[in-house]
Curated annotation (Swiss-Prot):
<feature type="site" description="Lowers pKa of active site Cys">
    <location>
        <position position="148"/>
    </location>
</feature>
<dbReference type="InterPro" id="IPR020605">
    <property type="entry name" value="Octanoyltransferase_CS"/>
</dbReference>
<comment type="similarity">
    <text>Belongs to the LipB family.</text>
</comment>
<feature type="active site" description="Acyl-thioester intermediate">
    <location>
        <position position="182"/>
    </location>
</feature>
<feature type="binding site">
    <location>
        <begin position="84"/>
        <end position="91"/>
    </location>
    <ligand>
        <name>substrate</name>
    </ligand>
</feature>
<comment type="pathway">
    <text>Protein modification; protein lipoylation via endogenous pathway; protein N(6)-(lipoyl)lysine from octanoyl-[acyl-carrier-protein]: step 1/2.</text>
</comment>
<dbReference type="InterPro" id="IPR004143">
    <property type="entry name" value="BPL_LPL_catalytic"/>
</dbReference>
<feature type="binding site">
    <location>
        <begin position="151"/>
        <end position="153"/>
    </location>
    <ligand>
        <name>substrate</name>
    </ligand>
</feature>
<feature type="domain" description="BPL/LPL catalytic">
    <location>
        <begin position="45"/>
        <end position="220"/>
    </location>
</feature>
<dbReference type="InterPro" id="IPR000544">
    <property type="entry name" value="Octanoyltransferase"/>
</dbReference>
<dbReference type="InterPro" id="IPR045864">
    <property type="entry name" value="aa-tRNA-synth_II/BPL/LPL"/>
</dbReference>
<keyword id="KW-0808">Transferase</keyword>
<keyword id="KW-0963">Cytoplasm</keyword>
<dbReference type="GO" id="GO:0033819">
    <property type="term" value="F:lipoyl(octanoyl) transferase activity"/>
</dbReference>
<dbReference type="GO" id="GO:0036211">
    <property type="term" value="P:protein modification process"/>
</dbReference>
<keyword id="KW-0012">Acyltransferase</keyword>
<comment type="function">
    <text>Catalyzes the transfer of endogenously produced octanoic acid from octanoyl-acyl-carrier-protein onto the lipoyl domains of lipoate-dependent enzymes. Lipoyl-ACP can also act as a substrate although octanoyl-ACP is likely to be the physiological substrate.</text>
</comment>
Length: 229
């Protein structure tokens, strides 16, 4: 298709399926995107899966199905055409972005099950703060009532995934008014903070990573260092 365990402790490598965890902090979008591409292009059947966690500088990204007509008034925020599925979305400070770089073939996962697992991890995370997250048929992501709280856009190349999920934690939502989010005119967006949840990115990241590890049977091993150029 082209278009830490739950307690936060570092477990021994032999427990569960190992995956490396990279906490990248605040980063511009394009270098991380290009690094994902390179990682996916050069990995082989023995490569360890990785999850990258990042908070992007302001950017609109337009997926392969995206139309410029859905970008209404970007202003000073750059628009980047990317190789993930889906339409247009916004990334910015206060949004938790997780990129699972997984060998889906090795995991025995189809794309539908993979998407379902990511959505379920977000739904389970929200439930920790008594927020009811839901799926919508034919509209990937997670919604609370009529508002979207997590956008999902992926690509699979040679059976391996890149791109991922963007989860609104405590962010300025105004830039979403400059686009038709995910290609839907008038789609509302919301955040964890606006719904009474925590504003701390570290708190939400720990909860979401634990749920992703549970969904996909991983034990996450934090690793230091930036990405190779």
């Amino acid at each position: 298709m082209d278009a830490v365990n739950a307690c936060g402790a570092v477990a021994p490598w032999h427990v569960g399926r190992a995956a490396l965890l990279r906490m990248l902090g605040a980063q511009p979008y394009v270098p991380v995107w290009h690094a994902m591409q390179r990682f996916t292009d050069v990995r082989d059947a023995t490569a360890v899966d990785e999850l990258w966690v990042v908070e992007h500088e302001p950017v609109f990204t337009l997926g392969q199905a995206g139309k410029l007509e859905h970008v209404l008034a970007p202003g000073e925020i750059p628009v980047v055409h990317v190789d993930r599925g889906g339409q247009v979305t916004y990334h910015g400070p206060g949004q938790l972005v997780v990129y699972p770089l997984l060998d889906l073939s090795r995991l025995g996962l189809g794309v539908r099950d993979y998407v379902y697992g990511i959505e379920q991890a977000v739904i389970n995370t929200l439930a920790q703060w008594n927020i009811l997250g839901e799926r919508r048929e034919h509209a990937p992501g997670v919604y609370v009532g009529d508002a979207k709280i997590a956008a999902l856009g992926i690509r699979v190349r040679r059976g391996c995934s890149f791109h991922g999920v963007a989860f609104n934690v405590a962010m300025d939502l105004e830039p979403f008014h400059r686009i038709h989010p995910c290609g839907y005119r008038g789609l509302q967006v919301t955040s964890v903070l606006d719904l009474g949840g925590p504003s701390e990115m570290d708190t939400v990241a720990a909860a979401l990573l634990a749920e992703l590890a549970r969904q996909f049977g991983f034990v996450l091993h934090p690793t230091s260092g930036w990405l190779s150029s």
